[in-house]
């Protein structure tokens, strides 16, 4: 059930979020404005990080309360231990 706060969540994101286990640790690659992580944190009790290359999108993520790392994915993800996440998302 999507609350009023997330009524505008893209239908494809809502569909994918359905498959994420409540309370899981999530890494959202290319997280954009943080909408997906915001939803997962608020509605499913998930924790995790978003990774975004675009500097202009970082403030919106922070405003939403998403832990975000500004980085080009070409640099790899060595900062995270193996098995640090239950789910990894990469949506466009």
PLM regions: where:
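A short beta-strand submotif of the Rossmann-like class I SAM-dependent methyltransferase core
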Residues: 90-91
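Conserved N-terminal segment of class I S-adenosyl-L-methionine
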Residues: 1-83, 87
């Amino acid at each position: 059930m999507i609350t009023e706060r997330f009524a505008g969540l893209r239908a494809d994101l809502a569909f994918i979020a359905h498959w994420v286990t409540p309370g899981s640790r999530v890494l959202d690659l290319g997280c954009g404005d943080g909408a997906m992580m915001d939803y997962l944190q608020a509605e499913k009790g998930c924790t995790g990080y978003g990774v975004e290359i675009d500097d202009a999108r970082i403030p919106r993520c922070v405003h939403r309360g998403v832990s975000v790392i500004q980085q080009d994915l070409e640099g790899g993800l060595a900062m995270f231990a193996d098995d640090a996440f239950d789910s990894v998302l990469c949506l466009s």
